[in-house]
């Protein structure tokens, strides 16, 4: 009998499941020429969900449907960035880098909309929370999300509108924690100005927590602009920042050619992922700048001690693992405990790479899972869900920034594959 997960995959990917059976490492699940929403905030109503149930844990949640206080809907400006799956819901973020974005945090209900090739997005938890003019408790701009082992959705609201030539820091950046069992806000922590003055560099968040110690969670937040690694501790409700030269971009790796666009980006530390538990209970934290082909590592024990952040010299606590090889610049990466493999979203290769952590870190041991320069243009996010499936978002961002998207072609895609199949046939087996 097919498992529920396999049946769900059949429903949302159709014939492409047969391609996977022949060894294709990534399955294209959804694709869009342009994004659309069940509630654009312009009077276009949610056809599936006209009845709104208020949530007392979110400010003014009765305004689930209706007009937007965040400006008129401009479809072309909506570019997805992050993707995270949890138990039938696929969370999709749309940072406010341009005007006309109705909701920055959204989801796809796979049971209701998984049949569609280009499903409409639903505002999460509702449209009201996504209206940044309504309340300081509402969302401005979210890049990526993360789900921890306690079933909580974590993300950073940058608090910034990144409109070209008109950036506005609407409010301080903040860390949000939502209980996905009931969609209630558990925590909103406003990041002090002494830690971060502007929020546009806070593009990802990684959660370090045990299933039986949910209140003792640590969040690692790379800051690609200020080249820092921020650490937030949930139980003490405190945050501190590490600085290190390893957080800087590599000037020899900042020249990119993606989607026919040639440009230079100086993005510093971009992604952090946790390795397996060691006998002493510690875990390695692997990290890298986006404009770099190097990988670095530090123990989580180092990061979790606030007094360590004040040191002027970190000694040998931070280590260079080595280089992944030419053209392996990566946005996000994620460790999979089932296979012991780290998977990388590789922007220059328009694909997914891998490294098996039991092998020496070297160019020879860095494998290629998938590469497609015409369809997986700029893989902006890569996550792994609790069932062992990789999810990748590709969004053609360089074309959007430096040229013009062809709205008659598919520009945004979400991909999926099990980690067991993804590593098959590579040096990561």
UniProtKB/Swiss-Prot annotation:
UniProt keyword annotations, A-Z: Glycoprotein, Isomerase, Melanin biosynthesis, Secreted, Signal
Pfam short name (any one): MRJP
Enzyme Commission identifier(s): 5.3.3.12
Chain ranges passing through the membrane: none
Gene3D superfamilies per UniProt: TolB, C-terminal domain
Enzyme kind, highest EC tier: isomerase
Domain of life: Eukaryota
Reaction catalysed by this enzyme: L-dopachrome = 5,6-dihydroxyindole-2-carboxylate
Family statement drawn from the similarity comment of this UniProt entry: Belongs to the major royal jelly protein family.
Record-given protein name: L-dopachrome tautomerase yellow-f
Gene: yellow-f
């Amino acid at each position: 009998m097919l498992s529920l997960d396999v049946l769900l995959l059949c429903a949302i990917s159709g014939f492409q499941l047969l391609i996977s059976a022949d060894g294709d490492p990534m399955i294209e699940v959804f694709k869009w020429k342009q994004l659309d929403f069940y509630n654009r905030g312009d009077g276009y109503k949610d056809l599936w969900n006209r009845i709104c149930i208020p949530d007392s844990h979110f400010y003014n949640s009765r305004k689930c449907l209706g007009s937007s206080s965040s400006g008129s809907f401009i479809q072309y400006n909506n570019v997805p960035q992050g993707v995270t799956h949890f138990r039938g819901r696929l969370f999709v973020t749309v940072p406010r880098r341009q005007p006309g974005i109705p909701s920055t945090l959204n989801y796809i209900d796979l049971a209701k909309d998984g049949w569609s090739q280009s499903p409409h997005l639903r505002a999460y938890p509702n449209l009201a929370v996504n209206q940044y003019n309504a309340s300081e408790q509402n969302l401005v701009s979210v890049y990526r999300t993360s789900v921890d082992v306690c079933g909580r959705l974590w993300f950073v609201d940058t608090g910034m509108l990144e409109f070209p030539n008109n950036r506005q820091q609407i409010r301080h950046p903040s860390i949000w924690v939502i209980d996905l069992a009931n969609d209630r806000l558990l925590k909103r922590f406003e990041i002090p100005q002494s830690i971060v003055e502007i929020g546009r560099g806070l593009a990802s968040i990684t959660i370090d927590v045990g299933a039986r110690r949910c209140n003792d969670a640590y969040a690692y937040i790379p800051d690609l602009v200020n080249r820092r690694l921020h650490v937030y501790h949930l139980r003490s409700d405190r945050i501190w920042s590490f600085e290190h030269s390893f957080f800087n971009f590599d000037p020899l790796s900042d020249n990119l050619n993606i989607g026919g666009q040639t440009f230079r980006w100086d993005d510093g530390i971009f992604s952090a992922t946790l390795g397996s538990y060691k006998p002493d209970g510690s875990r390695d934290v692997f990290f890298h700048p986006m404009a770099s082909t190097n990988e670095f590592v530090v123990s989580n024990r180092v990061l979790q001690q606030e007094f360590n952040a004040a040191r002027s010299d970190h000694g040998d606590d931070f280590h260079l693992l080595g280089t992944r090889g030419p053209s392996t610049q990566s946005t996000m990466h994620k460790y999979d405990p089932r296979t012991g493999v780290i998977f990388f979203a590789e922007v220059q290769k328009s694909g997914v790479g891998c490294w098996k952590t039991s092998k020496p870190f070297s160019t020879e041991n860095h494998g290629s899972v998938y590469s497609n320069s015409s369809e997986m243009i700029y893989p902006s996010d890569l996550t792994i869900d609790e069932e062992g499936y990789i999810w990748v978002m590709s969004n053609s961002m360089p074309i959007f920034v430096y040229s013009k998207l062809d709205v008659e072609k598919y520009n945004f895609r979400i991909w999926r594959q099990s980690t067991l199949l993804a590593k098959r046939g590579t040096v990561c087996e």
